[in-house]
């Protein structure tokens, strides 16, 4: 009929249908799109693959509520469409009736009946309705009837509305068809979902069958365990733990019995619930005849559940019987454990003895392993051992693979179970097999690591021994001989002990092989048991959750049914009279029957699960037994470790075989070391001989120099004697004799010069010979190096071969290390897996606590598993600890060798830090490379030592040559001494010559007259000769310069010698030029004093004068016959002086060897030389006087040329000169006495020097002994230097890195210098700006004054508005204070002190007080206006005015309010349905009422929004008005709600205007701005917290709903409040400090800025947290509204408003009086 009606209506109202097609209706399109999206989401949830039981459980339990939500939302959308369709059909019926009555001829009357019947049957549109939605639809039937009655009345009154209703009816018909199609599609999808759920339930039943099969398999496994009981004698080592586990199992049995009782109680409860359901179904059966059959089905399902409960009880009884059997078995096991413990004690004693012997052997081996080549032999032995261990590992792996195959066969038997359980089982099996394999591998690797550690420690010890041997090889030879003897005895003892141990090892190996078989079988059983335990635990947890959820669903169904019945009674509807309601109830009954079927299926599943639980309990008993056996397996694995240790001992025995080979290598090494030591001894001897030869050469050179100086002194003495004679005869000497003397002098000087050149040539020849010998030695060295290179090539070949062997061994070692590392990684993964298992076990414990009795059994099992896992972890930690110790040893080796620079920084950062594996491997490789390089360097050093020994041999030959040269020099010294004797003979000859001269004087007096005539001619010749003499003197000075270059070692005395030589040359020139004898004697006395003080200085210039002086003496003796007596006296004195000089020379010969030692004494004598220099200065003065005398004498000579005939005058002058000479002789005698006293002093000093020499000789002997010790230490340091050379190579890399860093630092320093220069420039610029700002500060005075006036005017206006008295006498003070304020503000940043500063501060304080008064007045005015607003809120006219004012304020602060309003509207409208076009025609009166009732709350909210918005607006206002100078009082007075903020803003305006004063004030202003913004943000956060608190208090009232999220939100809010309070306090403290301090330091300002920045970041975080809290609160509110809507959907907004709008009649309940705008919108927060 509906199709006929649709076709007829479409034909009659085509124009209306065309306008109301779904494509043309936006509302229909939106709802259809929503329904499509929800249907797609449902399909996605349904179509997901549920291959495993867990996924099906997720679909059933987790995704079921999502499906329910989607179905409910889908039903709402469909409900809206159905209501609209119902509304349209009713309107069409009424319109059709009216048209039929008006036009009976045109409209057939049958269509009316059809339409009426269809309208009656239309409400049955939802064929399948969810149980929770039925009450919503029941209440709509009454409302629809009322709406129809009102609509007919409305149609009877107006015909115009009929046409519009026709159009809407046609549109609704079209929409109804579309909705019917969509609804059918959704129902099909829903049926698919139900089918999927049924399939899932069938799968659950299949799982139950598989569980039964698994039980059968567990029985088979139990039988296998019974067979294995005979083999557990040697495996049960933990008796105490097993006893504890047995007690726990007994407790678990008792708990299991209690669980069975609990299940019976639950079954009784289920029966009571079934009875309740029967009563409910009976009620429904009385009202609904169609649902009786379905309720009968439910009863049948309940009976099935009862049967299943009975089966569960039977299973519990079987379980108790099994527990009794298990107790009997436990008793038998206890007896067996006693026996096993006895066997275990004996084995422990043996094992301890073996460990003690092993420890002794290890100690002895560690002491015996001292040589370098032991590492290679031990590495070979270790490689062989590793191969054997790898073979054993392969055997174990093959056995494990067989075990895995058996386990796989068992898993194939259990493959019928669920795929997910199968996957988990496989994963557990893999992990457990990996655990066992890795445990066995780890034990084997432990053994290998121990061996490698021992090898490594041995290598370390060997390296240390090598270094010690290199440091002290000379002393170590004897020690090595003694050690070798000891080692041979030790090795023999060790071999004997090894033989004993090998016998013990053979016996233990046989025992261990028997245990291995038992351990392998026990491992398999343990794996199976652990897998089954994990399975059963997971299944029990899932079953318990399903039982809980089913009970919850049953309770919810009962509650829903009761609610439905109550709602039917409240609606006052009779089901018998209302056919429509009956049909709807039938639909609901059908749904309920389906639900009952589902419940019955669920209950069947539960019963099956209970059976499975019983089976699981049975299996757990078996699993416990298997766990006990697995413990025995673990003990067996530990015994394996003992086996491996014993094997290690056997391997050590094999090591001792290699020790013999090592002994041969040691003997070779010892021979090499002995050769090296001999070479080193020779080297040391040669070095000492070289040093002695060098010292002797230096001594010889110094002696030669001393002899030369002594020779010169002798010559000087002779020259002095000749000068004395000269002084006596110079006045009487003839010009001819002078010319002859000068010619002889020239010839003699040339001869001496030639002699000196010959000596130089001889020395040069010697140097060239030495060079030639050195060249030959170099050639020999090159040939020797070539030979050594060939040897080196051979050695390098050998070394390369050894390196290849080392590399192969290193590779094997690295492979073993990689295996160890992999084992560690796998152990770490297993530890994580164990931790995950512990977490899972903990979750199972929590679930078992809820199910008290059943969970206790599982908790104990989990505790046992955890204890076992902890034991395994302890073992793993023990192994990890050993690995850490190994790593620590590696780190110590690295530190000792300084291989890695990062070790030091790592030790500084973290003590005993674990090195990553990759890093350890890299470092080990580096160590190996360094070891190879060290070996290569040692070989290279050996070769270098051999080369050095050859060089030392050559140096020894050179030393022999030098000794021969030394002998030659000694011969030369003997010749010199002989020459000295010849000189003495010459002296005697000179005395004879003096006698002859006396005889010749008589003859010369006769010739005197002749000579006087020839004086003039000869004087000219004399001048020419004098010039030639000066040239010769210059040549001589050049020669002296060359001699000075040879005496560079005496650099300190060089300058003094040069000065003395120059002075002596000047004195000699004057002595030759002058004929004055007195002057000659003075010069001689000064020279002697200088010579006595200087101890033989180079006075070679006097040697050249000796020959000339002899001739002069001959000529002068002829003239001075009258003065023979004086000359004899002088000769006697000179003889005495010569004797003293001879003695001094002898002393000098003794002192020549001590020149090197006495250099320090010469430094002390430098002071005496300074005194001598003072004496020389006095002599200089005397020389100046002598020069004057010489000039006078020259004048006299000229006069003598003129006065040739005046011989008488000249004779008189000669007499005068003779008198003067007598006086001078007296002076010279006094000087001689002084010299004698000085010579005595020198004798005393010489004696002291002799004493010193003796003391120094004793010290030299002591030092020689010390040098012997130092030589030994030097050899050790030499080898230390070799080691340090290796380190230098490493340090060079570090230095290069550091140089790079230094270069970077230099670049940074350059950049910093540039920056500093820039800063200096900026500082200068800033100083210039400060000077300008100082000038500008004066301009701010009127600004401050104007600000004070503005404040004053604001005060007057505010007080006049408040009708308060203005304080008198403030204008003048205010103006003055303002002026002072301007001065203070302008002067504070600069730092000047003035009187205006105090006045300005007073003015600002006065302004603060005024602003506070204004603030109080404004606050009072606010309160007063608020009271007026509250009083006037009752009147509508005043309300409208206030609303307009609020709108104005909103416009004023709309920028701040706009962001909040959308969020609030979205939060209110986000979760509701879309609006229907009919619903938009809402009643304005209801909206008006709602607006009036919520006026108070809106006013409060507006005030809060204004307070929150005020700070931000004030900040913007301040920023916008930075540069303005106008008064801002009216606007601020109008806008500000918080006068304190206004005062702060006014202050901030002043601060912002003064930001240009200086950098410090700008920083302070920025800090204040940040602090103010932070305080305002905190204020807004406080306000929002208050709002949220109020909302929570409203939503948390009793009777509404309870949600644990509220407690969490409250905690967050409390934490927010505390944080806000702390931040507010810190902001206040910082702002007060800045305001009080004013111009602070940059450091303090930076600290404050950092604190403010941190505070702002915290505030941002708090704002984000506040947003999250607001979201959670909104979600909670939405949840509350949804829960309200579910309970009170009968009073839903859409239905109520549609009914009210259309019908405008009927009674309204108290709940309908709530003011709502539309049913599709939520009410305000107050209504909620």
From Swiss-Prot:
Localization (cell): Cytoplasm, Cytoskeleton; Cell membrane; Cell junction, Plasmodesma
Principal location listed in the UniProt entry: cytoplasm
Biased composition (Basic residues): 1424-1439
Heme recorded as keyword: no
Entry keywords, A to Z: Cell junction, Cell membrane, Coiled coil, Cytoplasm, Cytoskeleton, Membrane
PROSITE patterns: NAB
An example Gene Ontology CC term for this record: plasmodesma
Expression (tissue specificity): Expressed in root meristems and at very low levels throughout mature vasculature.
Gene disruption phenotype: No visible phenotype, due to the redundancy with NET1B. Net1a and net1b double mutant shows a significant acceleration in root-cell expansion.
Domain NAB: 13-92
Function: Plant-specific actin binding protein. Associates with F-actin at the plasma membrane and plasmodesmata. May be part of a membrane-cytoskeletal adapter complex.
Subunit structure: Interacts with F-actin.
Record note on domains: The NAB domain, also called NAB (NET actin-binding) domain, is sufficient for F-actin binding.
Name of the molecule in the record: Protein NETWORKED 1A
Species classification: Eukaryota, Viridiplantae, Streptophyta, Embryophyta, Tracheophyta
């Amino acid at each position: 009929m509906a199709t006929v009606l649709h076709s007829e209506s479409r034909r009659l109202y085509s124009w209306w249908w065309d306008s109301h097609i779904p494509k043309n209706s936006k509302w229909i399109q939106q709802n259809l799109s929503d329904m499509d999206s929800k249907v797609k989401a449902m399909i996605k949830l349904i179509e997901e693959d549920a291959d495993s039981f867990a996924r099906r459980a997720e679909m059933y339990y987790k995704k079921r509520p999502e499906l329910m939500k989607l179905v409910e939302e889908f039903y709402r959308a469909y409900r809206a469409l159905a209501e609209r369709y119902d509304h349209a059909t009713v309107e069409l019926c009424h319109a059709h009736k009216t048209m039929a009555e008006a036009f009976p001829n045109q409209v057939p009357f049958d269509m009316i009946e059809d339409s009426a019947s269809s309208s009656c049957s239309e409400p049955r549109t939802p064929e399948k309705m969810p149980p929770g939605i039925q009450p919503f639809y029941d209440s709509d039937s009454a409302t629809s009837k009322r709406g129809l009655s009102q609509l007919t009345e409305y149609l009877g009154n107006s015909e115009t509305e009929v046409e519009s209703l026709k159009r809407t009816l046609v549109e609704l018909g079209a929409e109804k068809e579309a909705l019917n199609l969509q609804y059918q599609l959704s129902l099909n999808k829903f049926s698919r979902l139900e089918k999927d759920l049924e399939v899932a339930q069938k799968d659950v039943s299949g799982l139950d069958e598989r569980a039964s099969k698994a039980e059968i398999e567990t029985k088979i496994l139990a039988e296998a365990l019974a067979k294995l009981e005979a083999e557990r004698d040697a495996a049960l080592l933990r008796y105490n733990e097993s006893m504890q586990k047995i007690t726990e199992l007994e407790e678990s049995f008792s708990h299991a019995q209690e669980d069975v009782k609990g299940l019976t109680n639950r079954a009784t409860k289920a029966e009571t619930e079934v009875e309740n359901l029967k009563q409910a179904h009976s009620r429904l059966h009385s009202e609904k005849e169609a649902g009786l059959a379905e309720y009968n089905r439910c009863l049948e399902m309940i009976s099935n559940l009862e049967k299943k409960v009975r089966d569960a009880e039977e299973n519990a009884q079987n379980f108790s019987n099994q527990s009794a059997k298990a107790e009997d078995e436990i008793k038998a096991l206890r007896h067996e454990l006693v026996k096993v413990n006895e066997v275990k004690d004996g084995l422990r004693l043996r094992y301890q003895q073996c460990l003690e012997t092993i420890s002794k052997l290890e100690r002895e081996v560690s002491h015996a392993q001292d040589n370098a080549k032991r590492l290679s032999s031990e590495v070979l032995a270790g490689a062989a051992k590793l191969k054997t261990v790898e073979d054993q590992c392969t055997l174990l792996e093959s056995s494990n693979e067989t075990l895995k195959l058996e386990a796989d066969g068992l898993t194939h038997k259990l493959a019928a179970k669920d795929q997910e359980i199968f996957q988990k089982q496989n994963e557990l099996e893999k992990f457990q097999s990996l655990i066992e394999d890795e445990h066995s591998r780890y034990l084997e690797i432990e053994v290998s690591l121990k061996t490698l550690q021992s090898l490594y420690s041995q290598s370390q010890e060997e390296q240390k021994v090598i270094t010690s041997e290199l440091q002290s090889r000379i002393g170590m030879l004897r020690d090595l001989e003694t050690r070798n003897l000891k080692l041979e005895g030790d090795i023999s003892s060790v071999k004997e002990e090894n033989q004993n141990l090998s016998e013990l090892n053979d016996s233990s190996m046989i025992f261990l092989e028997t245990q291995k078989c038992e351990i392998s079988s026990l491992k398999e059983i343990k794996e199976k048991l652990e897998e089954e335990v994990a399975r059963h635990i997971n299944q029990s947890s899932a079953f318990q959750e399903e039982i809980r959820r089913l009970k919850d669903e049953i309770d919810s169904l009962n509650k829903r049914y009761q609610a439905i019945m109550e709602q039917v009674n409240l609606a006052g509807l009779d089901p018998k009279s209302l056919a429509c309601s009956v049909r709807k109830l039938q639909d609901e009954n059908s749904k309920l029957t389906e639900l009952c079927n589902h419940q019955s299926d669920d209950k069947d599943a539960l019963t099956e699960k209970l059976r499975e639980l019983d089976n699981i309990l049975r299996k757990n008993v078996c699993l416990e037994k298997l766990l006990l056996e697995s413990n025995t397996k673990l003990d067996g694995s530990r015994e394996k470790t003992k086996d491996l240790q014993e094997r290690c001992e056997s391997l050590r025995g094999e090591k001792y075989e290699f020790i013999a080979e090592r002994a041969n290598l040691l003997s070779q090494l010892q021979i090499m070391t002995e050769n090296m030591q001999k070479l080193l001894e020779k080297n040391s001897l040669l070095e000492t001989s070289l040093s002695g030869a060098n010292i002797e050469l230096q001594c010889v050179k110094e002696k030669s120099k001393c002899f030369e100086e002594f020779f010169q002194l002798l010559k000087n003495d002779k020259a002095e004697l000749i000068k004395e004679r000269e002084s006596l005869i110079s006045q009487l000497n003839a010009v001819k004799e002078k010319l002859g003397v000068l010619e002889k002098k020239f010839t003699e000087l040339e001869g001496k010069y030639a002699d000196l050149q010959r000596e130089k040539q001889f020395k040069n020849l010697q140097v060239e010979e030495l060079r030639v010998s050195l060249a030959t030695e170099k050639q020999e060295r090159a040939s020797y190096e070539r030979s050594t290179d060939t040897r080196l090539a051979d050695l390098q070949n050998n070394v390369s071969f050894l390196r290849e062997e080392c590399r192969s061994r290193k590779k094997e070692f690295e492979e073993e290390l990689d295996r160890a590392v992999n084992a560690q990684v796998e152990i770490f993964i297993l530890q994580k897996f164990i931790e995950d298992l512990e977490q899972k076990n903990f979750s199972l414990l929590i679930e078992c606590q809820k199910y008290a009795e059943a969970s206790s059994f599982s908790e104990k099992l989990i505790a046992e598993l955890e204890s076992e896992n902890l034991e395994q972890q302890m073992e793993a930690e023990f192994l990890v600890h050993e690995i850490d110790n190994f790593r620590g040893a590696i780190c110590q080796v690295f530190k000792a060798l300084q291989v890695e620079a990062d070790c030091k920084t790592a030790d500084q950062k973290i003590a005993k830090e674990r090195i990553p594996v990759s890093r350890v491997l890299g470092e080990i490789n580096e160590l190996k490379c360094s070891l190879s390089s060290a070996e290569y360097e040692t070989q290279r050093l050996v070769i270098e030592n051999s080369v050095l020994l050859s060089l030392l041999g050559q140096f020894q030959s050179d030393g022999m040559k030098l000794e021969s040269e030394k002998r030659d020099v000694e011969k030369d010294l003997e010749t010199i001494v002989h020459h000295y004797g010849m000189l003495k003979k010459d002296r005697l000859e000179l005395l004879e010559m003096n006698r002859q001269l006396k005889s010749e004087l008589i003859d010369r007096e006769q010739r005197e007259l002749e000579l006087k005539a020839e004086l003039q001619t000869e004087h000219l010749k004399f001048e020419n000769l004098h010039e030639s003499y000066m040239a010769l003197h210059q040549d001589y000075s050049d020669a002296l310069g060359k001699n000075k270059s040879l005496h560079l070692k005496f650099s300190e005395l060089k300058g003094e010698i040069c000065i003395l030589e120059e002075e002596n040359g000047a004195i000699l020139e004057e002595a030759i030029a002058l004929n004055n004898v007195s002057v000659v004697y003075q010069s001689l006395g000064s020279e002697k004093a200088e010579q006595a003080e200087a101890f033989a200085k180079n006075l070679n210039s006097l040697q050249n004068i000796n020959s000339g002086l002899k001739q002069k003496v001959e000529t002068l003796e002829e003239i001075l016959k009258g003065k023979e007596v004086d000359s004899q006296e002088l000769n006697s004195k000179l003889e005495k002086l010569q004797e003293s000089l001879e003695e001094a020379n002898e002393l000098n010969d003794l002192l020549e060897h001590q020149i090197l030692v006495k250099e320090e004494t010469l430094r002390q004598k430098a002071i005496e030389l300074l005194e001598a220099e003072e004496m020389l200065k006095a002599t200089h003065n005397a020389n100046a006087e002598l020069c004057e005398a010489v000039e006078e004498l020259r004048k006299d000579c000229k006069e003598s040329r003129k006065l040739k005939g005046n011989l008488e005058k000249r004779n008189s002058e000669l007499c005068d000169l003779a008198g003067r000479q007598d006086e001078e002789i007296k002076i010279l005698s006094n000087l001689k006495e002084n010299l004698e006293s000085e010579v005595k002093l020198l004798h005393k000093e010489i004696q002291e020097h002799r004493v010193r020499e003796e003391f120094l000789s004793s010290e030299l002997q002591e030092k020689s002994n010390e040098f012997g010790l130092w030589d030994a230490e030097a050899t050790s340091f030499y080898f230390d230097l070799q080691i340090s050379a290796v380190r230098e190579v490493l340090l060079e890399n570090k230095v290069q890195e550091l140089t790079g860093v230094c270069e970077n630092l230099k670049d940074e320093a350059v950049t910093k210098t540039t920056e500093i220069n820039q800063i200096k420039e900026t500082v200068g610029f800033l100083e210039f700006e400060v000077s300008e700002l100082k000038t500008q500060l004066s301009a701010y005075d009127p600004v401050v004054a104007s600000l004070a006036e503005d404040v004053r005017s604001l005060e007057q206006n505010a007080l006049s508005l408040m009708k308060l008295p203005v304080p008198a006498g403030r204008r003048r003070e205010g103006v003055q204070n303002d002026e002072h304020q301007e001065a203070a503000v302008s002067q504070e940043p600069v730092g000047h002190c003035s009187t205006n500063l105090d006045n300005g501060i007073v003015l600002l304080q006065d302004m603060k007080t005024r602003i506070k008064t204004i603030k109080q007045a404004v606050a009072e005015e606010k309160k007063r206006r608020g009271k007026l607003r509250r009083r006037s809120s009752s009147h509508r006219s005043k309300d409208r005015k206030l609303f307009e004012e609020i709108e104005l304020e909103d416009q004023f602060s709309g920028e701040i309010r706009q962001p909040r309003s959308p969020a609030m509207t979205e939060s209110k409208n986000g979760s509701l349905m879309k609006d229907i076009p009919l619903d938009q025609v809402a009643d304005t009166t209801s909206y008006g009422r709602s607006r009036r009732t919520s006026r108070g709350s809106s006013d409060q909210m507006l005030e809060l929004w204004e307070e929150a918005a005020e700070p931000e607006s004030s900040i913007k206002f301040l920023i916008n008005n930075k540069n303005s100078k106008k008064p801002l009082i009216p606007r601020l007075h109008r806008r500000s709600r918080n006068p304190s903020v206004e005062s702060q803003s006014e202050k901030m305006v002043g601060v912002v205007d003064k930001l240009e004063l200086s950098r410090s004030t700008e920083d302070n202003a920025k800090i204040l701005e940040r602090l103010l913004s932070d305080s305002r943000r905190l204020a807004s956060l406080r306000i929002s917290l208050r709002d949220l608190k109020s909302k929570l208090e409203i939503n948390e009232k009793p009777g509404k709903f309870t949600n644990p999220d509220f407690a969490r939100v409250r905690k967050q809010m409390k934490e927010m409040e505390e944080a806000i309070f702390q931040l507010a306090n810190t902001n206040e403290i910082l702002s007060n400090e800045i305001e009080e301090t004013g111009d602070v330091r940059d450091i303090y300002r930076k600290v404050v800025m950092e604190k403010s920045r941190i505070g702002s970041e915290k505030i941002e975080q708090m704002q984000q947290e506040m947003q999250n809290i607001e979201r959670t609160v909104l979600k909670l509110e939405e949840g509350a509204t949804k829960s309200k809507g579910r309970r009170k959907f009968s009073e839903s907004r859409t239905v109520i408003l549609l009914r009210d709008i259309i019908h405008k009649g009927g009674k309204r309940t108290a709940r309908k009086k709530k003011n709502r705008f539309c049913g599709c919108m939520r009410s305000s927060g107050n209504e909620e």
